[in-house]
Design a protein with these regions (language model features):
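Surface-exposed alpha-helical interface segments used for non-catalytic interactions
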Residues: 40-43, 47, 80, 108, ...
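Catalytic histidine-centered segment of alpha/beta-hydrolase-like enzymes
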Residues: 264-273, 277
Length: 285
Protein backbone atom coordinates (compact mmCIF):
# COMPACT_ATOMS: atom_id res chain seq x y z
CA UNK A 1 0.00 0.00 0.00
CA UNK A 2 1.17 3.53 -0.73
CA UNK A 3 -0.33 6.87 0.19
CA UNK A 4 -1.84 8.88 -2.67
CA UNK A 5 0.11 11.85 -1.28
CA UNK A 6 3.47 10.27 -2.14
CA UNK A 7 5.10 12.13 -5.02
CA UNK A 8 7.42 10.15 -7.32
CA UNK A 9 10.30 11.87 -9.11
CA UNK A 10 13.32 11.06 -11.27
CA UNK A 11 16.53 13.03 -11.62
CA UNK A 12 19.64 12.52 -13.75
CA UNK A 13 22.74 13.08 -11.64
CA UNK A 14 26.42 12.38 -12.27
CA UNK A 15 26.43 8.90 -13.78
CA UNK A 16 23.14 7.72 -12.29
CA UNK A 17 19.40 8.31 -12.60
CA UNK A 18 17.69 8.27 -9.22
CA UNK A 19 14.07 7.63 -8.41
CA UNK A 20 12.93 9.31 -5.22
CA UNK A 21 9.69 9.86 -3.33
CA UNK A 22 8.68 12.95 -1.35
CA UNK A 23 6.08 13.71 1.28
CA UNK A 24 5.43 16.47 3.81
CA UNK A 25 6.52 20.01 4.57
CA UNK A 26 9.04 21.24 7.11
CA UNK A 27 12.64 20.48 8.04
CA UNK A 28 14.29 18.46 5.25
CA UNK A 29 15.09 14.82 6.01
CA UNK A 30 16.47 12.10 3.77
CA UNK A 31 15.52 8.48 4.49
CA UNK A 32 18.06 5.97 3.13
CA UNK A 33 16.91 2.39 2.65
CA UNK A 34 18.88 -0.85 2.91
CA UNK A 35 18.91 -4.33 1.37
CA UNK A 36 16.78 -6.11 0.21
CA UNK A 37 14.58 -3.05 0.13
CA UNK A 38 13.83 0.21 -1.65
CA UNK A 39 12.30 3.57 -0.74
CA UNK A 40 9.16 1.52 -0.02
CA UNK A 41 10.49 0.49 3.39
CA UNK A 42 9.65 4.00 4.62
CA UNK A 43 5.98 3.95 3.49
CA UNK A 44 4.65 3.49 7.04
CA UNK A 45 6.97 6.00 8.69
CA UNK A 46 6.64 8.89 6.24
CA UNK A 47 2.98 9.75 6.94
CA UNK A 48 3.81 9.85 10.66
CA UNK A 49 6.44 12.57 10.14
CA UNK A 50 4.99 14.51 7.22
CA UNK A 51 3.44 17.23 9.38
CA UNK A 52 6.85 18.56 10.45
CA UNK A 53 9.37 17.34 7.87
CA UNK A 54 10.02 17.51 4.14
CA UNK A 55 10.80 13.84 3.56
CA UNK A 56 12.90 12.53 0.69
CA UNK A 57 13.17 8.75 0.22
CA UNK A 58 15.38 7.76 -2.74
CA UNK A 59 16.03 4.42 -4.34
CA UNK A 60 19.81 3.98 -4.08
CA UNK A 61 21.87 3.50 -7.21
CA UNK A 62 21.31 0.04 -8.66
CA UNK A 63 18.16 -0.59 -6.64
CA UNK A 64 14.43 0.05 -6.85
CA UNK A 65 13.53 2.13 -9.88
CA UNK A 66 16.89 3.90 -10.07
CA UNK A 67 19.42 3.10 -12.78
CA UNK A 68 21.99 0.32 -12.34
CA UNK A 69 25.58 1.49 -12.92
CA UNK A 70 28.16 -1.27 -13.12
CA UNK A 71 30.31 0.26 -10.37
CA UNK A 72 30.28 2.80 -7.58
CA UNK A 73 28.70 0.83 -4.73
CA UNK A 74 31.15 1.92 -2.06
CA UNK A 75 29.28 4.04 0.44
CA UNK A 76 31.34 7.16 -0.24
CA UNK A 77 30.16 7.12 -3.86
CA UNK A 78 26.58 6.23 -2.93
CA UNK A 79 26.56 9.06 -0.38
CA UNK A 80 27.81 11.35 -3.12
CA UNK A 81 24.70 10.54 -5.15
CA UNK A 82 22.55 11.58 -2.21
CA UNK A 83 24.48 14.80 -1.66
CA UNK A 84 23.93 15.65 -5.31
CA UNK A 85 20.23 14.91 -4.87
CA UNK A 86 19.66 16.81 -1.62
CA UNK A 87 22.05 19.74 -2.03
CA UNK A 88 22.63 20.27 -5.73
CA UNK A 89 19.23 19.21 -7.11
CA UNK A 90 16.76 19.95 -4.30
CA UNK A 91 18.72 22.89 -2.90
CA UNK A 92 18.77 21.93 0.78
CA UNK A 93 21.67 23.61 2.57
CA UNK A 94 21.11 21.68 5.81
CA UNK A 95 19.17 18.48 6.40
CA UNK A 96 18.61 15.45 8.64
CA UNK A 97 19.89 12.01 7.62
CA UNK A 98 18.32 8.68 8.62
CA UNK A 99 19.60 5.34 7.31
CA UNK A 100 18.67 1.70 7.83
CA UNK A 101 20.72 -1.43 7.05
CA UNK A 102 23.14 -0.47 4.22
CA UNK A 103 21.49 2.93 4.34
CA UNK A 104 23.07 3.46 7.77
CA UNK A 105 26.73 3.22 6.62
CA UNK A 106 25.73 5.38 3.66
CA UNK A 107 24.17 7.88 6.06
CA UNK A 108 27.34 7.88 8.15
CA UNK A 109 29.45 8.66 5.10
CA UNK A 110 27.10 11.42 3.98
CA UNK A 111 27.34 13.01 7.43
CA UNK A 112 31.11 12.54 7.61
CA UNK A 113 31.70 14.10 4.20
CA UNK A 114 29.34 17.03 4.85
CA UNK A 115 29.35 17.68 8.60
CA UNK A 116 28.30 21.31 8.21
CA UNK A 117 25.21 20.36 6.19
CA UNK A 118 23.95 17.33 8.14
CA UNK A 119 22.27 18.58 11.30
CA UNK A 120 21.38 15.18 12.81
CA UNK A 121 22.23 11.56 11.97
CA UNK A 122 20.20 8.46 12.87
CA UNK A 123 21.48 4.96 12.11
CA UNK A 124 19.12 1.99 12.31
CA UNK A 125 20.32 -1.57 12.96
CA UNK A 126 23.73 -1.31 11.30
CA UNK A 127 27.08 -0.14 12.74
CA UNK A 128 29.81 1.96 11.13
CA UNK A 129 32.11 -0.05 8.81
CA UNK A 130 35.73 0.18 9.83
CA UNK A 131 34.99 1.01 13.44
CA UNK A 132 34.65 -2.61 14.56
CA UNK A 133 37.34 -5.32 14.71
CA UNK A 134 37.58 -7.53 11.64
CA UNK A 135 34.52 -9.79 11.50
CA UNK A 136 32.69 -8.13 14.38
CA UNK A 137 29.06 -7.41 13.69
CA UNK A 138 28.65 -10.16 11.14
CA UNK A 139 26.63 -12.16 13.66
CA UNK A 140 27.97 -15.60 12.76
CA UNK A 141 25.31 -17.89 11.32
CA UNK A 142 22.66 -15.17 11.64
CA UNK A 143 24.46 -13.05 9.06
CA UNK A 144 26.00 -15.71 6.83
CA UNK A 145 24.85 -13.71 3.83
CA UNK A 146 27.35 -10.89 4.47
CA UNK A 147 30.17 -13.11 3.25
CA UNK A 148 28.13 -15.07 0.70
CA UNK A 149 27.04 -11.89 -1.08
CA UNK A 150 30.68 -10.86 -1.50
CA UNK A 151 31.53 -13.97 -3.55
CA UNK A 152 31.90 -12.91 -7.21
CA UNK A 153 29.06 -13.99 -9.55
CA UNK A 154 27.88 -17.05 -7.60
CA UNK A 155 25.01 -15.42 -5.65
CA UNK A 156 23.51 -14.04 -8.86
CA UNK A 157 23.66 -17.44 -10.53
CA UNK A 158 22.04 -19.27 -7.62
CA UNK A 159 19.29 -16.73 -6.98
CA UNK A 160 18.29 -16.12 -10.62
CA UNK A 161 14.62 -17.04 -11.07
CA UNK A 162 14.28 -17.59 -7.31
CA UNK A 163 14.24 -13.96 -6.21
CA UNK A 164 10.99 -14.22 -4.26
CA UNK A 165 12.08 -17.37 -2.42
CA UNK A 166 15.40 -15.79 -1.49
CA UNK A 167 14.14 -12.36 -0.44
CA UNK A 168 11.13 -13.67 1.43
CA UNK A 169 13.41 -15.72 3.67
CA UNK A 170 15.11 -12.53 4.89
CA UNK A 171 11.80 -10.77 5.51
CA UNK A 172 10.45 -13.68 7.53
CA UNK A 173 13.68 -14.43 9.43
CA UNK A 174 14.48 -10.80 10.17
CA UNK A 175 11.26 -9.80 11.91
CA UNK A 176 10.37 -10.32 15.55
CA UNK A 177 6.62 -10.58 14.97
CA UNK A 178 4.53 -12.35 12.33
CA UNK A 179 2.52 -10.46 9.73
CA UNK A 180 4.83 -7.48 9.20
CA UNK A 181 5.03 -8.00 5.44
CA UNK A 182 1.93 -8.61 3.35
CA UNK A 183 2.01 -10.49 0.07
CA UNK A 184 1.70 -7.12 -1.66
CA UNK A 185 4.70 -5.75 0.24
CA UNK A 186 6.87 -8.70 -0.74
CA UNK A 187 5.63 -8.48 -4.33
CA UNK A 188 6.72 -4.83 -4.51
CA UNK A 189 10.25 -5.68 -3.36
CA UNK A 190 10.42 -8.69 -5.69
CA UNK A 191 9.22 -6.51 -8.59
CA UNK A 192 12.30 -4.32 -8.38
CA UNK A 193 14.85 -6.98 -7.40
CA UNK A 194 13.73 -9.21 -10.28
CA UNK A 195 14.69 -6.56 -12.82
CA UNK A 196 17.87 -7.17 -14.84
CA UNK A 197 20.97 -6.30 -12.84
CA UNK A 198 19.16 -5.53 -9.59
CA UNK A 199 20.36 -8.52 -7.58
CA UNK A 200 23.93 -7.95 -8.78
CA UNK A 201 23.69 -4.31 -7.71
CA UNK A 202 22.41 -5.36 -4.30
CA UNK A 203 25.26 -7.83 -3.84
CA UNK A 204 27.70 -5.11 -4.91
CA UNK A 205 26.79 -3.15 -1.77
CA UNK A 206 28.30 -6.07 0.18
CA UNK A 207 31.26 -6.46 -2.19
CA UNK A 208 32.19 -2.84 -1.55
CA UNK A 209 32.58 -3.44 2.19
CA UNK A 210 36.41 -3.71 2.12
CA UNK A 211 36.55 -0.33 0.39
CA UNK A 212 34.08 1.11 2.90
CA UNK A 213 36.25 -0.11 5.78
CA UNK A 214 39.39 1.36 4.19
CA UNK A 215 37.73 4.71 3.48
CA UNK A 216 36.39 5.05 7.01
CA UNK A 217 39.60 3.96 8.70
CA UNK A 218 41.49 6.55 6.69
CA UNK A 219 39.06 9.12 8.07
CA UNK A 220 39.31 7.82 11.65
CA UNK A 221 43.11 7.98 11.47
CA UNK A 222 42.85 11.77 11.27
CA UNK A 223 41.00 11.86 14.59
CA UNK A 224 37.75 12.93 12.95
CA UNK A 225 34.52 12.58 14.91
CA UNK A 226 31.01 13.44 13.81
CA UNK A 227 30.08 16.81 15.35
CA UNK A 228 26.28 16.59 14.99
CA UNK A 229 23.93 14.75 17.38
CA UNK A 230 23.68 11.08 16.45
CA UNK A 231 21.12 8.41 17.29
CA UNK A 232 21.64 4.66 17.05
CA UNK A 233 18.64 2.34 17.24
CA UNK A 234 18.50 -1.42 16.88
CA UNK A 235 15.82 -4.02 17.13
CA UNK A 236 15.58 -5.58 20.55
CA UNK A 237 14.83 -8.98 18.99
CA UNK A 238 17.24 -11.77 18.16
CA UNK A 239 18.51 -10.14 14.98
CA UNK A 240 18.79 -6.61 16.34
CA UNK A 241 22.13 -4.97 17.00
CA UNK A 242 21.27 -2.08 19.31
CA UNK A 243 24.27 -2.27 21.65
CA UNK A 244 26.72 -2.70 18.80
CA UNK A 245 25.38 0.35 16.98
CA UNK A 246 25.30 2.68 19.98
CA UNK A 247 28.83 1.67 21.02
CA UNK A 248 30.02 2.23 17.47
CA UNK A 249 28.52 5.73 17.34
CA UNK A 250 30.02 6.64 20.71
CA UNK A 251 33.47 5.93 19.28
CA UNK A 252 33.01 7.95 16.08
CA UNK A 253 30.74 10.82 17.22
CA UNK A 254 30.99 13.56 19.82
CA UNK A 255 27.31 13.23 20.76
CA UNK A 256 25.70 9.80 20.59
CA UNK A 257 22.56 8.32 22.09
CA UNK A 258 20.22 5.44 21.38
CA UNK A 259 19.21 1.95 22.38
CA UNK A 260 16.91 -0.94 21.53
CA UNK A 261 13.34 -0.95 20.29
CA UNK A 262 11.53 -3.73 22.12
CA UNK A 263 9.71 -6.53 20.33
CA UNK A 264 11.38 -5.57 17.07
CA UNK A 265 13.73 -7.35 14.71
CA UNK A 266 15.85 -5.90 11.93
CA UNK A 267 13.19 -4.14 9.85
CA UNK A 268 12.49 -1.29 12.27
CA UNK A 269 10.67 1.14 9.91
CA UNK A 270 8.12 -1.53 9.01
CA UNK A 271 7.90 -3.40 12.31
CA UNK A 272 7.64 -0.41 14.65
CA UNK A 273 6.95 2.75 12.61
CA UNK A 274 5.07 4.52 15.41
CA UNK A 275 7.83 3.93 17.96
CA UNK A 276 10.49 4.94 15.45
CA UNK A 277 8.58 8.14 14.65
CA UNK A 278 8.29 8.90 18.37
CA UNK A 279 12.00 8.42 18.97
CA UNK A 280 12.97 10.47 15.93
CA UNK A 281 10.71 13.34 17.00
CA UNK A 282 12.22 13.25 20.49
CA UNK A 283 15.76 13.16 19.07
CA UNK A 284 15.04 16.09 16.73
CA UNK A 285 13.14 18.25 19.23
Amino acid sequence: MTSPDFQHHYVNLKGVRLHYVTLGQGRPMILIHGWPQTWYEWRRLMPLLADKFSLVAPDLRGLGDSSRPSKGYDKKTVAGDLWNLMHDHLGFERFIVVGHDWGAPTAFRLAADHPDAVTHLAMLDAPVPGDLPQGAGLGGAQRWHHLFHQVPDLPEALVYGRERLYLEWFFMAGTDQAGVFSDADIAEYVRTYSQPGAMRAGFNFYRALPQDVADNRELFATGFKLPMPTLGLGGGGSRGRADLIVQSLRRVALRASGGAIADCGHFIPEEKPEELARQLREFLA
